Curated annotation (Swiss-Prot):
It catalyses: AMP + ATP = 2 ADP. GO terms for biological process: AMP salvage. It holds the Pfam family ADK_lid. One of its GO terms (cellular component) is cytoplasm. It comes from Borreliella burgdorferi (strain ATCC 35210 / DSM 4680 / CIP 102532 / B31). Zn(2+) binds at residues 125, 128, 145, 148. Gene3D superfamilies: P-loop containing nucleotide triphosphate hydrolases. This is Adenylate kinase. AMP binds at residues 31, 36, 57-59, 85-88, 92, 155, 166. Monomer. ATP binds at residues 10-15, 122, 131-132, 194. The keyword Kinase applies. Residues 30-59 are annotated as: NMP.
Length: 211
């Protein structure tokens, strides 16, 4: 079975991907990871992607589709997987339907203010990279890592103004995609503002549901 996870940054889809992957032996396929893997292995596509990224451009649909299709074909037959970060637009969605027509689409719904609170509160240790949150996972000493005692910092792209820009771009990019899947009654919406266990239960129900 194939699952497609759609949702803005901070919606929890990355966390849920790890949980489903570990508990149900699904393979987590991220386009970002595939790009890095191809660049690291210096494949023909990887070399092309590296040049594109170094120019500050977006990787074209044809390359993204090719990399995802190759990865899915390379997976052992009947292996379950989660697609994270693909498709991102109608062109990619139509291509996915051609080589993999029966995936389940799960859309993580969450209020923008909650996303901003979640991500703007994130703090990362400079020494050990452990992640904390000033709202949901506080440290004993303000600004100090509980694990190694290192200093905590806030990533530039976790600052409120940057987050608002990222969320605006996400909405513009995915709105046509959401409409595309809604029209053919394939979209499964999940409330991502609740606790992780509740989200997991809802996704398991979707996984068990017949197409």
């Amino acid at each position: 079975m194939g699952l497609v996870f759609l949702g803005p940054p901070g919606s929890g889809k990355g966390t849920i991907s790890k949980i489903i992957s570990n508990e149900f032996k699904y393979q987590h396929i991220s386009t970002g990871d595939l790009f890095r893997e191809n660049i690291l292995n210096s494949t023909a596509l990887g070399q092309e992607i590296k040049k594109i990224v170094e120019r500050g451009e977006l990787v074209p649909d044809l390359i993204t589709i090719k990399i995802v299709e190759d990865k899915i074909k390379a997976i052992k037959k009947n292996k379950d997987f989660i697609l994270d970060g693909f498709p991102r637009n109608i062109c990619q969605a139509e291509a996915l339907d051609k080589f993999l027509p029966n995936v389940k689409i799960i859309n993580f719904l969450i209020d923008e203010e909650l996303v901003i609170k979640r991500l703007s509160g994130r703090r990362i240790c400079k020494s050990c990279n452990n992640i904390f949150n000033i709202y949901t996972l506080t440290t004993k000493k303000n600004g100090i890592c509980d694990v190694c005692g290192g200093d905590l910092y806030q990533r530039e792209d976790d600052k409120e103004e940057c987050l608002k820009t990222r969320l605006k771009e996400y909405k513009l990019q995915t709105k046509p995609l959401i409409e595309f899947y809604s029209k053919c009654s394939r979209l499964n919406n999940v409330d991502a503002s609740v606790k992780i266990d509740e989200i997991k239960k809802k996704i398991i129900k979707i996984m068990l549901k017949k197409n």
